[in-house]
Amino acid sequence: MASVSLLSALAVRLLRPTHGCHPRLQPFHLAAVRNEAVVISGRKLAQQIKQEVQQEVEEWVASGNKRPHLSVILVGDNPASHSYVLNKTRAAAEVGINSETIVKPASVSEEELLNSIRKLNNDENVDGLLVQLPLPEHIDERKVCNAVSPDKDVDGFHVINVGRMCLDQYSMLPATPWGVWEIIKRTGIPTLGKNVVVAGRSKNVGMPIAMLLHTDGAHERPGGDATVTISHRYTPKEQLKKHTILADIVISAAGIPNLITADMIKEGAAVIDVGINRVQDPVTAKPKLVGDVDFEGVKKKAGYITPVPGGVGPMTVAMLMKNTIIAAKKVLRPEELEVFKSKQRGVATN
């Protein structure tokens, strides 16, 4: 009798609905019948999105439009940046988007970099433009991000896109936060009225993730209608734990290995790991990538979890491709774009 009861309980855990009529086990989960978290495959989800983008690109071209073009500016010789850019250009080729990488030395002046951006802004053949971050210390990253034309800003970092996002209006969404949103949405994890903790408040990742999850879902862009708590470097870990232990969804984007451990997570919570940290493998003594979450410990308690690598990273690249086809279709509101172009020409606007 005890074994029958155990099997019944396990069946209830695996099959209970999580969003509407969707069962617990969704496509793109790496799961077996076991009493631990469903591991969400970001690679498989990203492949699905890239297939959607590829179809959209081919339909766009078949309608008589030019093939979308993505320009990437890469400054310096940071190996990680070179690897990220290569992943982006490979993905572009995969979905039928033309791309180019413009490499600048680490010694490039800020003004020279800004001039290159202006030329690409004015190039009608360029639909999407991104400058790979981080940049050398002598270059103001915020100034560079704001120099990219908002309608070509596939990173979603321009102040106009950030502002529109905060106002529940259509904008280019930052790729990583949008990727996190798509993981949650496509996995069927409910957000309406749920408690969410976002560890990390960076302007490019943590803050926009929180914005997407807490905002009204009735507007033009994604909105999760969740109750969101944001922590940061000055949040004591014990204080963080008081929030995460109550959270239905925990998203860590702090860049701190083992920040989130099993004792901080409530049973069945969804844990999304955005962290990318390079540490030394204690067995091989070689460098390896880990996230912010103690993966092995947390997956025994959580309901869903993303791995590092293979979780959020591939989704970031996929959403960049989605932003590029959006940029090619020129759907940004013309009034904001005209203000930006007037300022670039040095024309005063009211």
Curated annotation (Swiss-Prot):
Binding, substrate: 84-88, 131-133, 309-313
Primary subcellular site in the record, as a coarse category: mitochondrion
Cellular-component GO terms for this entry: mitochondrial matrix; mitochondrion
Positions annotated to bind NAD(+): 200-202, 233
SUPFAM superfamilies linked: Aminoacid dehydrogenase-like, N-terminal domain, NAD(P)-binding Rossmann-fold domains
Cross-link type Glycyl lysine isopeptide (Lys-Gly) (interchain with G-Cter in SUMO2), residue numbers: 50
Transit peptide start-stop: 1-35
Molecular functions per Gene Ontology: magnesium ion binding; methenyltetrahydrofolate cyclohydrolase activity; methylenetetrahydrofolate dehydrogenase (NAD+) activity; methylenetetrahydrofolate dehydrogenase (NADP+) activity; phosphate ion binding
EC number: 1.5.1.15, 3.5.4.9
The organism's place on the tree of life at top rank: Eukaryota
Disulfide bonds: none
Note: This NAD-dependent bifunctional enzyme has very different kinetic properties than the larger NADP-dependent trifunctional enzyme and is unique in that it requires formation of an enzyme-magnesium complex to allow binding of NAD.
Function of the molecule: Although its dehydrogenase activity is NAD-specific, it can also utilize NADP at a reduced efficiency.
Subunit comment: Homodimer.
Name of the protein described by the UniProt record: Bifunctional methylenetetrahydrofolate dehydrogenase/cyclohydrolase, mitochondrial
UniProt lineage: Eukaryota, Metazoa, Chordata, Craniata, Vertebrata
